[in-house]
Amino acid sequence: MAAGELEGGKPLSGLLNALAQDTFHGYPGITEELLRSQLYPEVPPEEFRPFLAKMRGILKSIASADMDFNQLEAFLTAQTKKQGGITSDQAAVISKFWKSHKTKIRESLMNQSRWNSGLRGLSWRVDGKSQSRHSAQIHTPVAIIELELGKYGQESEFLCLEFDEVKVNQILKTLSEVEESISTLISQPN
């Protein structure tokens, strides 16, 4: 295979985007054959396979180390000097790709590494109670809190909580105690 066949910036940029979608964002259906036929149709499969593995390995190395731009430049320079490494044009495309996709890839990796549900959203409001078994409780303020919980790649679950004034005051007291404990721990000398 001629070196120029794997040099083009647009096909390499497309390949890196597809690898990121497959590896970090969980989009199925991105196959080696699809990538080769769409991006490098002139390259035989037996020559494309090692190139694909090399690019996937480089991308995984960069992402797993969460490289900043100085680390990235040093890493890519080392890759260009390595026997069977990458060309300086390929390094430039990889660098440009990482600069524009680092945040999304990092966020995706963080989401995938969480085992438990996380808080995706919170909304609250204060209403006046309009119905009650006891007429004295009608028109008293009620805090309604809605929590949106979920894991990466799954639909959210919603939890709706209702608190009267007494419960809100208890929660505020508990939060003040937690804040006090944290402040005490932080202000202690090592």
Curated annotation (Swiss-Prot):
Chief localization: nucleus
Keyword Protease: no
Phenotypic consequence of residue 110 to A: Reduces copper-induced fluorescence change
InterPro entries in UniProt: COMM, COMMD1_N, Murr1
Modified residues (N-acetylalanine): 2
Keyword tags: Acetylation, Copper, Cytoplasm, Cytoplasmic vesicle, Endosome, Lipid-binding, Membrane, Metal-binding, Nucleus, Protein transport, Transcription, Transcription regulation, Transport, Ubl conjugation, Ubl conjugation pathway
PTM comment, free text: Acetylated by EP300 ina stimuli-specific manner; protecting it from XIAP-mediated proteasomal degradation and required for interaction with RElA in response to stress. Ubiquitinated; undergoes both 'Lys-63'- and 'Lys-48'-linked polyubiquitination. Ubiquitinated by XIAP, leading to its proteasomal degradation.
Domain COMM: 118-186
Subcellular location: Nucleus; Cytoplasm; Endosome membrane; Cytoplasmic vesicle
Chain segments carrying region Sufficient for interaction with SLC12A2: 2-123
GO biological process, one term: protein localization to cell surface
Domain of life: Eukaryota
Span list, region Required for binding to PtdIns(4,5)P2: 125-190
Family stated for the protein in its record: Belongs to the COMM domain-containing protein 1 family.
Function (record text): Scaffold protein in the commander complex that is essential for endosomal recycling of transmembrane cargos; the commander complex is composed of the CCC subcomplex and the retriever subcomplex. Can modulate activity of cullin-RING E3 ubiquitin ligase (CRL) complexes by displacing CAND1; in vitro promotes CRL E3 activity and dissociates CAND1 from CUL1 and CUL2. Promotes ubiquitination of NF-kappa-B subunit RELA and its subsequent proteasomal degradation. Down-regulates NF-kappa-B activity. Involved in the regulation of membrane expression and ubiquitination of SLC12A2.
Subunit-structure text: Component of the commander complex consisting of the CCC subcomplex and the retriever subcomplex. Component of the CCC (COMMD/CCDC22/CCDC93) subcomplex consisting of COMMD1, COMMD2, COMMD3, COMMD4, COMMD5, COMMD6, COMMD7, COMMD8, COMMD9, COMMD10, CCDC22 and CCDC93; within the complex forms a heterodimer with COMMD6. Interacts with VPS35L; the interaction associates the CCC complex with the retriever complex. Identified in a complex with an E3 ubiquitin ligase complex composed of TCEB1/elongin C, CUL2, SOCS1 and RBX1; in the complex interacts directly with SOCS1 and CUL2.
Listed name of the protein: COMM domain-containing protein 1
